[in-house]
């Protein structure tokens, strides 16, 4: 049986006026997503601005979400450290705080061969007793492994899944085929949830369910039941909101602005050096939400 499956929302990180973590805001987003029926939460993912948060801010995010969630659904913590020692330290904190899993990326500064990458994950998993997911995001991490190489990492005992933020559905299929049935292969994009579930993916780890959580859950459930008649228009709805993430390599502020326009009390500021929202992007977000039927013009 798979440890994790379904719609896991990559949460945005909410700040207060002083740049600290808005714990009330994080708690409110947690309640909203849990009540919307998503199957899990991911904090400190790539859309949670993790690479630009101090360890203190990261810990505050973990604490706020785990405390509010109260084990109603799993909370997975993004581990995005360049060095193995720091990755171990943050994974240990996540476990001690009550998180249910860790999504571990390895962002390269120096090129590493397959054995060095494997050794990093092996040391991480040996040091911390928590379920790990491998994060395959070559566009950001600059680490490009084949499905067979990822399957080798999957052989480490407490690696239970992988997030595949890639466009090639055949690579997702190859990873599914190369791993055991209880290994959870997630797509990192709701935009290809239909195609990836057709080849064996077990759900999505994605930020777009912040905007349409109910539809994301219904899309997943419809695909799981083989009901393409219901799934097809829901998948099309995600294509409509796709410009929120597809229109920028740094969509963090756009997604926050979408949430703000939909009534969530969240500041749209992001951590430097991420770009702040422009007036043109505010209009772009509004027009996208109108086109998706989520706002009136």
Where are these regions (language model features)?
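Active-site beta->alpha loop and helix N-cap motifs at the rims of alpha/beta catalytic domains
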Residues: 2-9, 14-144, 259
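C-terminal alpha-helical cap/extension of soluble enzyme domains
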Residues: 6-13, 32, 36-38, 198-201, ...
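Alpha-helix N-capping/helix-start residues
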Residues: 17, 23, 55, 147, ...
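Short capping/connector residues at structural and topological boundaries
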Residues: 17-20, 114, 150, 275, ...
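A general structural signal for well-ordered alpha-helical segments in protein cores
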Residues: 26, 58, 62, 87, ...
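Short secondary-structure transition/capping segments
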Residues: 53-56, 89, 114-117, 145-147, ...
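Short helix-capping segments at alpha-helix termini
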Residues: 67-73, 96-98, 128-130, 155-158, ...
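Catalytic alpha/beta core domains of metabolic enzymes, predominantly
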Residues: 126, 138-239, 245-246
